[in-house]
């Protein structure tokens, strides 16, 4: 497996790999990573679909990319997906997955046209004082110490950031900046999250820094992630003969290690309460989704809070599988699951889905986001963060294009609400969010959009229906880590198995993205099948001086360098640098970026 960039490799079709007709594949998990592995086995590995078996414990494919309607309780959306135009592996896949809505076009075509006709951007990034615009005004408000610390983090080698928290590498002044408000709520970082992962994010998305304050960097699907991404992909695979075996609870993959040659020899599972095994030979490939950020999710509804009584650190079926595999390693080569799942108080947050068709509530929404959600276009353009809830629930909410579900009633609006802090009282509801019913969560949201306090309780009960989801491990992959804590996609010496998803290690890319999952699936197949075509490298904006200069300009709130708060010594050095680059291409680049007048 090798990386590539450019259209030569991107447009080419690989030859059929040697031995493809002898291969069979078993894929544990039908999240985006597992489905992507199946896709690449079919398209580029050219393995017959009938020889590819997806093993899924649940009765529905998609993993964390879900979206569903419970006929008794209402709509559930655990989360949403923010996409980037440089998700190279994602678009490589979806350009060949047919749309299930528009005949003759791909999912990528459909998505591309949608976001051209209806580009995403926010008209109110944050609110305060019960629905008033907080006027972040696209500014980052970085002080000098914070800006320098971010620059240093950008350039620090990953090895030097292992097991470090963000709070260990950034100054206290950073937490009061708009940059941190945008960053934390957009990506769900916490102060105790991995400094290594934050560095990856800075490097990965420096070309989008101008689009962070108003979300103009983002693109979204037409419907929820299940209907827009998972369903077309599953239908593509089924059309090629790939089978999805539901109710398969995989407990272990037995791996034999003989002098460094590692071979998966057996899959151990339960189905319908009965144990079973699948014996494997070297031509049987096994793709393992190790760990899951939505493991042991707990659901609530309008009248019931989520039941958290069964949540225990380290407990969860995906973690149990990974632990069973990791225990077989001789040198820790299958990762360290405990690093990610041993402190759910550090890794949880909670979301809610509010359903309403009430005109007065919708008018409150319109007053904040300046758009009518019933028009079927971008509404909030990303989350609206409630700035004065930072010491309480730290609430944000968003309305994506409506309807979010094809089954949604006309003129009904679905609002997705999430909170980074679940163990503190709300501003209005004097309970921790995790202890609240859907109705109580709705009250807090209604308060923050400006509903009069004497009407909040009635409106939450009679004009809305709210479901909730507490996810104990949703931020597990943000825990401080070493490179060795996640297994390589294909561990050294592995003959017929690979790891997939957010807890597999691949260079430079960032977790909590659709791209990361798909990339691991592609890399796994290309490595084990020896597909002779390049895997698209992570977009290289961190190596592009134009993007770096532009990022610097926006990070200092679009000030030329002669307006920055510099010391006398720094001003003298700057003057010398400007003189040295005079008449060169670098001077042109500095002027084009805005840093030089």
PLM-predicted stretches and their roles:
Residues 42-69:
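Glycine-rich FAD pyrophosphate-binding loop
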Residues 203-285, 289-291, 303-304, 309-311, ...:
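Helical element adjacent to the flavin cofactor pocket in flavoenzyme catalytic cores
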Residues 37-50, 236, 240:
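A short, Lys/Arg-enriched amphipathic alpha-helix followed by its capping loop at the start of a domain
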Residues 100-207, 219-220:
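Rossmann-like flavin
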Residues 1-25, 43-51, 555-563, 567-597:
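Extreme N-terminal leader/targeting segments of oxidoreductases
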Residues 205-221, 283-285, 290-520, 526-540:
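C-terminal segments that line or cap access tunnels to active or ligand-binding sites in enzymes
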Residues 72-113:
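Conserved FAD-binding subdomain of flavin-dependent enzymes
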Residues 29-35:
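Glycine-rich Rossmann-fold phosphate-binding loop(s) that bind the pyrophosphate
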């Amino acid at each position: 497996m090798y990386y590539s960039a450019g259209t030569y490799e991107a447009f080419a079709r690989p030859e059929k790999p040697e031995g493809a007709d002898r291969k069979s594949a078993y894929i544990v998990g039908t999240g985006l990573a597992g489905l992507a592995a199946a896709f690449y086995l079919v398209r580029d590995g050219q393995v017959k679909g009938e020889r590819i078996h997806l093993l899924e414990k649940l009765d529905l494919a998609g993993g964390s990319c879900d979206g569903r309607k419970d006929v008794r309780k209402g709509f559930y959306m655990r989360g949403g997906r923010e996409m980037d135009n440089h998700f190279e592996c994602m678009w490589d896949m979806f350009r060949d997955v047919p749309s299930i809505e528009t005949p003759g076009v791909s999912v990528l075509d459909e998505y591309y046209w949608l976001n051209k006709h209806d580009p995403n951007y926010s008209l109110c990034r944050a609110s305060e004082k019960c629905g008033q615009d907080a006027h972040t005004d696209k500014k980052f408000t970085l002080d000098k110490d914070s800006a320098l610390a971010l620059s240093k983090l950008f350039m620090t080698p990953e090895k030097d950031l292992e097991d470090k928290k963000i709070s260990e590498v950034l100054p206290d002044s950073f937490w009061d900046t708009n940059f941190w408000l945008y960053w934390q709520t957009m990506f769900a970082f916490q102060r105790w999250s991995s400094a290594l992962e934050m560095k990856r994010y800075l490097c990965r998305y420096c070309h989008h820094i101008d689009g962070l304050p108003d979300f103009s960097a983002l693109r979204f699907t037409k419907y929820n992630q299940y209907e827009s991404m998972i369903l077309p992909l599953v239908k593509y695979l089924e059309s090629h003969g790939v089978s999805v075996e539901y109710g398969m609870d995989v407990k272990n993959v037995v791996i034999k290690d003989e002098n460094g040659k590692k071979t998966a020899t057996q899959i151990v599972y339960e189905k319908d309460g009965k144990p079973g095994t699948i014996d494997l030979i070297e031509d049987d490939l096994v793709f393992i989704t190790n760990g899951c950020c939505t493991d042991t999710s707990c659901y609530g509804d309008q009248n019931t809070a989520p039941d958290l009584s069964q949540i225990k650190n380290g407990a969860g079926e995906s973690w149990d599988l990974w632990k069973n595999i990791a225990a077989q390693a001789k040198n820790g080569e299958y990762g360290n699951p405990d690093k990610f799942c041993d402190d759910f108080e550090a890794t949880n947050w909670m979301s809610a889905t509010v359903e309403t068709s009430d005109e007065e509530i919708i008018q409150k929404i319109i007053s904040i986001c300046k758009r009518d959600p019933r028009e079927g276009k971008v509404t909030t353009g990303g989350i609206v963060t409630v700035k004065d809830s930072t010491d309480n629930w730290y609430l944000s909410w968003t309305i994506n294009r409506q309807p979010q579900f094809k089954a949604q009633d006309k003129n009904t609006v679905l609002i997705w609400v999430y909170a980074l802090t679940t163990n503190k009282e709300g501003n209005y509801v004097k309970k921790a969010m995790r202890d609240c019913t859907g109705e109580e969560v709705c009250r807090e949201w209604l308060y923050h959009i400006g509903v009069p306090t004497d009407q909040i309780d009635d409106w939450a009960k009679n004009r809305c229906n709210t479901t909730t989801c507490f996810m104990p491990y949703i931020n597990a992959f943000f825990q401080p880590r070493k490179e060795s804590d996640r297994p390589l996609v294909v561990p050294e010496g592995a003959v017929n198995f690979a790891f997939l998803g957010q807890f597999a290690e691949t260079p430079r890319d960032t977790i909590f993205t659709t791209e990361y999952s798909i990339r691991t699936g592609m890399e796994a197949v290309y490595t084990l099948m020896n597909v002779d075509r390049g895997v698209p490298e992570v977009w290289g904006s961190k190596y592009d001086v134009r993007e770096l200069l532009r990022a610097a300009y926006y990070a200092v709130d679009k000030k030329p360098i002669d307006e920055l708060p510099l010391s006398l010594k720094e001003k003298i050095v700057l003057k010398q640098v400007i003189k040295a680059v005079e008449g060169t291409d670098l001077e042109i680049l500095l002027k084009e970026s805005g840093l030089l007048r």
